[in-house]
Amino acid sequence: MDDSQWVSIHIRDRLAQGNITIRESFLYEGQFHSPEDEKKALTEDDIDQLIIPSEGIGEVCARGRRGSEGWMDLFDGEKKICELHWDNRTKRPSNEFEVIDGDKDYKIECSGWSPQAGPLGHVFIDISAAKKKAAAAAAAK
């Protein structure tokens, strides 16, 4: 498979407790593959079995001759953290990566990807607990 259109999503669990899991992953174009071996294809079911432990990192990779478009939901137990969506198909003038429906109880940071047409590259997603406004106000006194 042509490796010119690829994305590698690094999800870091910075929560003090619990695991982050992936659900409802879907790839419209392209193919998921193992981070260790791009020739080893993975299914959406394989991606949905990924468990990222507290203070750990999980990696989801996809590529395709004409790029890929996909999405996945991140969960903390039964609570949805957010949805991740990307699109780096070759017919688009630019790349897109977005965090959708982020839960206010989590701080979700996204960095590293290329908005220019071509490979999305490495995307870094850091998930931590959001600071509560009341706790921040009390600490400021």
Curated annotation (Swiss-Prot):
It is found in: Cytoplasm. It holds the Pfam family Aegerolysin. InterPro entries: Aegerolysin-typ. One of its GO terms (biological process) is symbiont-mediated hemolysis of host erythrocyte. Keywords: Cytolysis, Cytoplasm, Hemolysis. The keyword Cytoplasm applies. The keyword Transmembrane does not apply. GO terms for cellular component: cytoplasm. Its main location: cytoplasm. Disulfide bonds: none annotated. Hemolysins are potential virulence factors. Has hemolytic activity against sheep erythrocytes in vitro. Belongs to the aegerolysin family. This is Terrelysin. It comes from Aspergillus terreus (strain NIH 2624 / FGSC A1156). The lineage of its organism: Eukaryota, Fungi, Dikarya, Ascomycota, Pezizomycotina.
